[in-house]
């Protein structure tokens, strides 16, 4: 089990690295995280919802994501409130206190799921959450030492040296553990190291003497193009000042969800992706994207209050391309109705009015994988997108109805692997504004290249050459690069001793 001294120390990436290493060594390996708190989620082939961290870890292990890899998903909806998703389905909304009291009821389920994974695989790599030293949560813990006890798992503790204070955080974490918990920790990993290892080594020896646990690796600081939750969160706080031919502004909503949708856009050469939030001007980008939201009405009110809604409408008048995904699509419409107060105490809110659609919130959540083709449309009246095959997944509570004159954007041909005859999204007559419920639509490189090249042509600039590999191939290369870096800087012989119970 991989635990850390705090959030964002690199647990998710190291779990993925171990999954790829064990896979390369010929083992059947599966990732597992009992409880994930995130707004980035994924829908499986069965239409079940799970955290994206276990999705990229499954990809690293070269297996399909399954909801039992992440049986509990918490999606914050407001301060101290979250939607609780158990085994891929919505259980209900709870306050932090309500969920804390509810957790003991989940232990038997976690035990059964873990045993199922253990019996059908050679190795289960478990990821913890935050820190195991949250002593106020120890009695009801099901994600750190509580999960280690359920699985009877040895633990590797990870510290982030890049933030400073790594020795204090590692020592303090170990000292705050109970003796039975401390005995589970078989090794220490130092992550995100920059500098001369020889200067660090005396400190490692002193730490080992203090805690009587070996340091089994020092992982160098390295950036990877992987949809890891922590690195994505960091990117939301950054503003890219690099010069580029194409500028894309993504609105940083307070409850932004599934910002993994923009991974490929961020990888495109000559494209500058900026996340625009409070006290920032949108400027004059080539494209604006309003992403998904876990609190669509609340985030739309936020856009109106901080002036971003008015700015989006003004930029629209210049002919700039605007796209909305899921909650962003709903915001582009005329209004959003919530008569049953599924999401908000308010029953209605006016939208941006850029698409002739109207959304009605319903209590039943839609979670489904879909595939289809973009209809015969021209974005900006020039970019031919008709016939491009797209696939993705829907996660939403609302139903959106198009006005009499507006056209759908995508022809849905398959839903949950079954043929259907349906439509998704909407696009205006000029091709300047479109919306869709499909998360993952911008993972389709043909569509992304069409849009980028169309924007380049509009500015009289040379177009980019088409890539010869898919996003899946690009990610697979990164998983292998990640595994190589970790394998070269960790004592894998000792890791296998831990697995054999010899450490």
Curated annotation (Swiss-Prot):
Pathway: Cofactor biosynthesis; adenosylcobalamin biosynthesis. Keywords: Cobalamin biosynthesis, Glutamine amidotransferase. Signal peptide: none annotated. One of its GO terms (molecular function) is ABC-type vitamin B12 transporter activity. One of its GO terms (biological process) is cobalamin biosynthetic process. InterPro entries: Class_I_gatase-like, CobQ/CobB/MinD/ParA_Nub-bd_dom, CobQ_GATase1, CobQ_N, CobQ_synth, GATase_3, P-loop_NTPase. The active site is at 326 (nucleophile), 439. SUPFAM superfamilies: Class I glutamine amidotransferase-like, P-loop containing nucleoside triphosphate hydrolases. Residues 245-447 form the GATase cobBQ-type domain. Transmembrane segments: none annotated. Belongs to the CobB/CobQ family. CobQ subfamily. PANTHER family: COBYRIC ACID SYNTHASE (PTHR21343:SF1), DETHIOBIOTIN SYNTHETASE (PTHR21343). Catalyzes amidations at positions B, D, E, and G on adenosylcobyrinic A,C-diamide. NH(2) groups are provided by glutamine, and one molecule of ATP is hydrogenolyzed for each amidation. This is Cobyric acid synthase.
